[in-house]
């Protein structure tokens, strides 16, 4: 760990001025810089252009070396807009890769790709920094034990459990509850696992980033009174930024998460929204650097770039990084190289359904479309596996019968099918759950449901012990005891009305 060479401070300027170059060409966000013979910077070194533009405005642009061109020239990609840069301007080689602040000082704050705070809450302690380019942990450091990462969310833990140190794809359109689900996971990991979260906003809308920040402050995930008690650090490289920033912002977020895992020995949740934008930015940079495009116009290094990022997300003997990545599927084509490359790395998928959201069932996780490699008897145990399979079979049968019900009505079904439908409707409602972060909007207190409680609840519904209870008793409750208590209250209310 060392001082970030790109941040200004006492004693840094003398270090910076050791190796100077000059801009010889500018094409959009790409700069060609010439250096004296024998003083070429290394690949991935950070270069800083400082000076004034034609109207006297100060310029401070950081770039990253991508190619050594020969003739003492390097090609670098800018991390911010290149407006005002001119040929002949002085370029400082910092002699090291981009480094960003890490540790407790990052919690509750918003950073850009360079690790500079952008929330106007004052400077951040930069005594502890870490370079954004690091190799993945060695095999000997990895924790190979397969273990479930309990989220306290019934539908996730039962039907598509997350792996500790795994990677989860989050699929869902606008307005189906993705943000609320993300905030609930951040809240639950802090309370149940004593962990922290890092949110990487990669190439998404600035408005969404701002909304997320405001909602986090409202729900207490970011503590405004005591910022150090916040549970999340935010790193944004949004749509309006140059491709260099969007390509590297994921690595900045990952570097912050790695420190919490390796040094603080914590369980960390890393959110990347959206992993497709990371690939898209890489494609833009690749074209600007003059590389021959591959299939569908993507960069030839697509698999390598994705692998470099994903392999750093893992469990070690110190702690774990569990990553949840929102995946945009262009034109709903799952065979597109970007989502297809992402799928190769995922351990589980959580699919959010607009149909369930329309019914008011939140979290709107589709129980039949969501999958997990962890749902195997040898990992989750025989009982969990059997109940998960029976829940899926019941819901699948209900789905098959829906056309018949719509045309002929429930009365035309056999006794067995009617029972299946009744249980499926109870299961569907019991998969909903009140969230802690939604208390502000709904007024009902949030519930964390342990895995054992979840299994017991669905076991009771499937066994038929609760067939006599009304289905609305299962809607938006925590464990099964709350459902039976709610049923008694409903019965008392109906008796009073009589």
UniProtKB/Swiss-Prot annotation:
It is a peripheral membrane protein. One of its GO terms (cellular component) is chloroplast thylakoid membrane. It comes from the Eukaryota. ATP binds at residues 172-179. SUPFAM superfamilies: C-terminal domain of alpha and beta subunits of F1 ATP synthase, N-terminal domain of alpha and beta subunits of F1 ATP synthase, P-loop containing nucleoside triphosphate hydrolases. PROSITE patterns: ATPASE_ALPHA_BETA (PS00152). It holds the Pfam family ATP-synt_ab. GO terms for molecular function: ATP binding; ATP hydrolysis activity; proton-transporting ATP synthase activity, rotational mechanism. Produces ATP from ADP in the presence of a proton gradient across the membrane. The catalytic sites are hosted primarily by the beta subunits. Belongs to the ATPase alpha/beta chains family. F-type ATPases have 2 components, CF(1) - the catalytic core - and CF(0) - the membrane proton channel. CF(1) has five subunits: alpha(3), beta(3), gamma(1), delta(1), epsilon(1). CF(0) has four main subunits: a(1), b(1), b'(1) and c(9-12). This is ATP synthase subunit beta, chloroplastic. It comes from Jasminum nudiflorum (Winter jasmine). The lineage of its organism: Eukaryota, Viridiplantae, Streptophyta, Embryophyta, Tracheophyta. The gene is atpB.
């Amino acid at each position: 760990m060392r001082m970030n060479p790109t941040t200004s401070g006492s004693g840094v300027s003398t270090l910076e001025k050791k190796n100077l170059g000059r801009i010889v060409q500018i094409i959009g966000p790409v700069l060609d810089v010439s250096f004296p013979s024998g003083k070429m910077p290394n690949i991935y070194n950070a270069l800083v252009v400082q000076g004034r533009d034609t109207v006297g405005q100060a310029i401070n642009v950081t770039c990253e070396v991508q190619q050594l061109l020969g003739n003492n020239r390097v090609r670098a990609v800018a991390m911010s807009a290149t407006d005002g840069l001119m040929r002949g301007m002085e370029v400082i080689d910092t002699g090291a890769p981009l480094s960003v602040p890490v540790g407790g000082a990052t919690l509750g704050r918003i950073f850009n790709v360079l690790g500079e705070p952008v929330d106007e809450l004052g400077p951040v302690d930069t005594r502890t920094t870490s370079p954004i380019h690091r190799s993945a942990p060695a095999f000997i450091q990895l924790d190979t034990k397969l273990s479930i990462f309990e989220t306290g969310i019934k539908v996730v833990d039962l039907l598509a459990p997350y792996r500790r140190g795994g990677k989860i794809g989050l699929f869902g359109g606008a307005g189906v509850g993705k943000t609320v689900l993300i905030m609930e996971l951040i809240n639950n990991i802090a309370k149940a696992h004593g962990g922290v979260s890092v949110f990487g906003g990669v190439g998404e809308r600035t408005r969404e980033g701002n909304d997320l920040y405001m909602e986090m402050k409202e729900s207490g995930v970011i503590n405004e009174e005591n910022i150090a008690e916040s549970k999340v650090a935010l790193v944004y490289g949004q749509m309006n930024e140059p491709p260099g920033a969007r390509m590297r912002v994921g690595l900045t977020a990952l570097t912050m998460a790695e420190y919490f895992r390796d040094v603080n020995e914590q369980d960390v949740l890393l959110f990347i929204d959206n992993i497709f934008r990371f690939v898209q930015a890489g494609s833009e940079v690749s074209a600007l650097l003059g590389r021959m495009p591959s299939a569908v116009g993507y960069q030839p290094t697509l698999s390598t770039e994705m692998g470099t990022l994903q392999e750093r997300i893992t469990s070690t003997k110190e702690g774990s990084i569990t990553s949840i990545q929102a995946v945009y599927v262009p034109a709903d084509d799952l065979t597109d190289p970007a989502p297809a490359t992402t799928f190769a790395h995922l351990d589980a998928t959580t699919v959010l359904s607009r149909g369930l959201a329309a019914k008011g069932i939140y979290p709107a996780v589709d129980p039949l479309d969501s999958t997990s490699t962890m749902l195997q008897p040898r990992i989750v145990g025989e009982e969990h596996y059997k109940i998960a399979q029976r829940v899926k079979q019941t819901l699948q049968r209900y789905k098959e019968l829906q056309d018949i019900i719509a045309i002929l009505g429930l009365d035309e079904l056999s006794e067995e099918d009617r029972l299946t439908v009744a249980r499926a409707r109870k299961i569907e409602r019991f998969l909903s759950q009140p969230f802690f972060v939604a208390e502000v909007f709904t007024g009902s207190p949030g519930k964390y449901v342990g895995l054992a409680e979840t299994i017991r609840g669905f076991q009771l519904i499937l066994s038929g012990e609760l067939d006599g209870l009304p289905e609305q008793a299962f809607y938006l409750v925590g464990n099964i005891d709350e459902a039976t208590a709610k049923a008694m209250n409903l019965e008392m209310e109906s008796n009073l009305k009589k």
